[in-house]
Each structure stands twice: as C-alpha cells, then as structure tokens.
Amino acid sequence: MWPTLRYVGGVCGLARYCVAGGFLRASGPASGVPGLLCGGGRRSSSTSSFDIVIVGGGIVGLASARTLILKHPGLSIGVVEKEKDLALHQTGHNSGVIHSGIYYKPESLKAKLCVEGAALIYEYCNLKGIPYRQCGKLIVAVEQEEIPRLQALYERGLQNGVEGLRLIQQEDIKKKEPYCRGLMAIDCPYTGIVNYQQVALSFAQDFQEAGGSILRDFEVKGIEIAKENSSRSKDGMNYPIAVKNSKGKEIRCRYVVTCAGLYSDRISELSGCNPDPQIVPFRGDYLVLKPEKGYLVKGNIYPVPDSRFPFLGVHFTPRLDGTIWLGPNAVLAFKREGYRPFDFDARDVMEVILKSGFINLVFQHFSYGVNEMYKACFLSETVKHLQKFIPEITISDVLRGPAGVRAQALDRDGNLVEDFVFDGGTGEIADRVLHVRNAPSPAATSSLAISRMIAEEAQQRFKL
C-alpha cells in the first residue's frame, strides 16, 4: 500500500497518494505499430494489445516497466514514448548526481525513496557494470548565518538514515576540497555521479529481454474506453482501454501507468482525472568549467539550501567525462521542453498563467525570481556566486553549457509541491490508471525504489 491516502475531489473522484509530508540502442521499428521495438514480448494475439501500458520512456517509466515485468512475467507490458529515442528529456538533461537523501523532510516519500533508491542504484550499476563514481559531496556554509541551517540539515540527514554524514570544519574542508573556502560543511561521502541516460537504457534492455515491448514515436493524445467493432469484440472485452496517439493509431490495454514527466498533468486529464497539481516548467542553465581549471573541483560542492525553495542552488558537479558543471539556476521556461531562453509555446505559457498558481508564486518570491533571471542573463552574476566557494574562479574560466527543464508541480495557491505525488482515481477509466504526478529530483536516484512502490500498488489496485 502507498503510505498515506489523501482524498482530493476532482473530475473522477481522484484519490491522491502521498506521504503527509556504453549506450544500448534498441532495434529499429517493426511493422504494425509505429516505432515498435521488439523484445520477444509476451503480447496478446494482437500486436497492439497489452495487459499494462506505461506512458513515458524516461527513467521512472522504464524502471517501473522493468520491475513490473520481472514481478509479473506472465503479463504483456508495453511502454509508449513520444520521442524517437528513450530518456531524452529530464533523464537526459540532469546533473547526474546520485543523491544521498539528506535534503528531504523526514518521513516524506522523497526521504524514504531517495535513501532506498541510492542503495539500489549503486547495487544495479555494480551488477551491470555501469560506470559511476562515489565522489562524495560537501554542503558548505560560507556565512556565519548559514551555520544553524547547516546543522539543522545535518540532523535531518541523520533522521533520514543517510550513511556516513559528518560535520567538518575549515581544515577538513581544505583536505577534501583544497580550493574551497567555507566555515563549516556537511561531508556526504555516499553521494555519487552516474549517467542516468545510460542507466535508463539499461532498464529498457532488461525490460525487453524479459519480454516487454517499447513503442517509440507514439505521442499519447487520448486514453478512452475502447469502442467496439465486430473484428475486435474479443479485444474489447479483454482490453477495454484504448490509448491513442497523435497520428490516429491506438493500442488496447487493461491498465495504464503514466510516468509522463513534463506532461503528467495533461496525461492525467486525458484519462478523466484531476489535472491538479499543474506542472510548471523551470529551466536550469549550466556553465562548464574550462578543462584547464578542472583541478579546482574534486567532488560535488553545494551551498546550504534555502528551505523556501525546492531548488538546491548553484553548485559544482563533476561529470564522468571529466568536465565540471556549474549551476543550475532556476527560471521559468516558456515551453515545456524549452531548453533555450527564447523557446516559446503559447499553450504552455497560457496554462502556466491561467491554470496554475504561478502568479501567486511570483508575488510570494518576487525578489528570488528576479535574481534568478538576472543570473541567467549575466554570466558575471553566477560567477560572483561561485566565487563565494572557490575564489580562484574567474569569468574567463567558464563557458555556457547545457540546460535542463524540471517539471515542478504547483498547486492553485502558488505553493511548490515538495514531495513526490502519485495519483489513483475512481471511475470507468480512472480505476484502471495510476499516475506519477510529481517526480522531480531526486526521482532519478529514487527510480528503482519508486518502481517497487508502483509495482506493489499496481498489484493491489489492479489485482494482478
């Protein structure tokens, strides 16, 4: 069972579950369904009918598909992904950190699943030979007024069961990060780095080898009760849900699990469920330290976070390829997949303004938003922040790097939804659907733990 049930009224009488508080490339498309990746699947007699369809080919969707098929090898399970490749968006545009679980409210889903998920990710990478580096992390207080918050964060980490935490002083900071200045820090030795896209593609390989099927280039535009015709009457009885794509194709299934990331609210609404909480896309821009300055950073270096926001602040992150990423900031993206500053989609912007509580959020945190926009526009402002930790960095040492877009759930009052949110519902369709509604960081770290929870709930809810 999912830990705590909270009922939220909606179109389908929604029941929301939350705690109170290298690369393997799949084979090309097969005939029949667009973008079908054959995996020796245990499909029904129709190649487009499945017991369970999972919407979303990111790391959470693929982990969930893998866990479900390993737990229920007799079921036919398919994953649908709107892109031509897997794990392209949030999974492929993050800093690659294996988080320890220190930041999250005790007893929350994030706290529980991150600690559990980190252990599972390390175990999985060891099993599969996927490269990672357990390089650790320092959370550094550079001002006296940050020390009480740092100490409180340390206590929170202990409550969450994070391994190996210790508070260290200036001399020990220098031993771990010779070029970093700070008054006090939390040493998190369990933090690591990995390529999550590679992990996700390995999940996909496991899923296909176990008999699952992946349908790429299948953008879901409808989740409906299947309409009967004489040729498919048997399918209609056994597979009552029709999942339709933007090209007019459909697949039939008994149950649906959605892991739609940036589109989780829209996919929920397609199934007749409550679109709240709404997704607001935040773009994060990274800088890259020039290679000749890579010696300045050994492991992850993070600031003491501001508890008012779910963002962890501009930080230093080593990558497996030897580069050092600096950032990200957090600014509103004017498109759900808007990786460039001037990417724009009118529908996405109007939904943020009219449907979410974004305007309230702006009024509540106006100065923070202005500061983030300023840092996005002026490189020198971000560098000034970085110099608080490593004074030797200059503006000539950094280059503009990649960007990612974070799907952040926001309620109607303008409050950022802090915890993971998973929805079920009641109704002809909603009884057969489970939604992953809010799964920002640390969802990649937590992906295997999340998948276990989804599999357990699917077994009980769908009586598998």
From Swiss-Prot:
The catalytic activity, as recorded, is:
(S)-2-hydroxyglutarate + A = 2-oxoglutarate + AH2
Q: Is the keyword Transit peptide in the record?
A: yes
State the compartments where it is located.
Mitochondrion
The enzyme class is oxidoreductase
A single Gene Ontology biological process assigned to it is: small molecule metabolic process
Cofactor dependence is on: FAD
* Location of the transit peptide in the chain: 1-52
One Pfam family named in its UniProt record = DAO
N6-acetyllysine: modified positions: 105, 174
Q: Which domain of life is it from?
A: Eukaryota
- Cite the InterPro entries for this sequence: FAD-dep_OxRdtase, FAD/NAD-bd_sf
Protein EC: 1.1.99.2
Keywords, sorted A to Z:
Acetylation, FAD, Flavoprotein, Mitochondrion, Oxidoreductase, Transit peptide
Q: Which GO terms describe its cellular component?
A: membrane; mitochondrion
GO MF annotations in UniProt? 2-hydroxyglutarate dehydrogenase activity
Similarity annotation: Belongs to the L2HGDH family.
Q: What is this protein called?
A: L-2-hydroxyglutarate dehydrogenase, mitochondrial
Originating species: Mus musculus
